[in-house]
UniProtKB/Swiss-Prot annotation:
The keyword Transferase does not apply. It comes from Mycoplasma genitalium (strain ATCC 33530 / DSM 19775 / NCTC 10195 / G37). Keywords: Cell membrane, Membrane, Transmembrane, Transmembrane helix. It is a multi-pass membrane protein. This is Uncharacterized protein MG226. To M.genitalium MG225. The chain crosses the membrane at residues 16-36, 39-59, 107-127, 133-153, 162-182, 210-230, 243-263, 291-311, 350-370, 394-414, 429-449, 454-474. The keyword S-adenosyl-L-methionine does not apply.
Amino acid sequence: MQTNKQPKQQFSEKQFIAFVFNYIAGFGFISVVMTMFDVGPFSYLVLGLTSFAILGVVLSFSRLSVLCGNSAYGGSYLIAKKAVGTNSKTKRFFVFLSGWNVSLTGSFNGVVIPAVLIFSFADIPVVKANNNIIIGLLVGGFLLFGLLTFISLFGLKINKKAIFYFAVIKWIVVIGGFILGIYLIGTTNGKGFVENNLIGTRENIDFFKIIFISLALTIAFAGTEDLASITPDVKSNNLRKCFLIAFGCVVLLYLVGFVIISGLDGIRGYGLALGNKDPKAINNYGSIYRLVGGVPLLVIYGLGLLVNSLASRLSMTITTARKYVALAQDGFLPSFLAKTNKHNEYHHAVLISNLMTLLVMLIMVIIPFLPDHNNNNNSLFNAIEQLVTVTIEMAAAISLIQYFITFIFFFMIFAKKENQKLIPLWEKVSYVISFALVSVLLFVPLFPFNQWTVFNTFKIVVLICFYLLGVGFFGYAEWKNKNKYQLMNNNS
């Protein structure tokens, strides 16, 4: 029987910390870490700037989790309600905009799933060169997407078990790469530690390149804004501690991984005769496996990347569905989205979440048909790679928009006299610095007037269209519920 009651809490504190750590950390970092060394010694600056910016976001979410509590879904959406209230149309619009924006991140991140089989085995030459293999892997990716949608309908209890088993394989591959990396460092006597920390012949190291690489690194922290939306499922009286412990573990892992990888020789072909086409070039994390064990180890890596993507999508479905639930409970979206099935899962919200992802996929298909000077040979693999790159950049932009909005609401809440005493001076300073960093990382790449391409225009147009879709839902909700907003005020 369907119901819209609140499901019982499914996570203990330890389980939630592990869920947060597994949700954020892993392949997001290793997929972009190689690009950090394009700026030589400034790679440390990139890691520091990005980590500090996200730390401010985590601190704000953890601080607000104390103030707003964990009795309802919504995360940053609840923060917006706390900051401005819902007693006027303008206030309700900004509250809805916050909730709608954060719900888009899962849809854009989910686009990568059908392509994951291709990238899992991309280091095998025959995969890139054979369009039939690429199409077959793409079809397999869509079948996996459907399977994950089916699994996610069985509630957190089943999802937690699936995520756990997927996570075990994922971390074997990640840590295995670190160990193999140490082995490779030994074979070159640590040459990379010097090579990767010199500017040398690297070209065009400037402010914009550092900012763009920092933006790419925010992908390694993707999902931070999602996790506040599932706090009602956590049995904890100290969510702030949970967030900070998990984030500390993520940063520690990244620091260890960064130090190890910085010792590798030939990252992205630097210093090699044939550049990134040299057989010894380490162009991605899978190259570490290939250099040590050839194709057999590379296949193991590919399976690990695949499993990680499956776990990420399951986790993403859990968080994204609950964002729709919060909007539905307040009348902005149809009320049936707040109903649960016999497994205590918001099955309608899960299905809508995946339908939104499919909608994004259909729109992103336009990308390969846009003029691209880097794909003159019309390679199918390069076209899919460009599609995924642009989509991930859009997902990163949406996350940064959410951080930006949340900071504004955060400052509004703690500008009130009764809340000012809750925050020590050092924490206030960190928020201001983090807000400045988030602003730079958001607006400079989104409007790179010195390097504008057709892809920048495409990204902005698509984002505007999705926001207009949200405005349509808001307008309909205003018309339908114009006499019912007292219910929302009672929940504010």
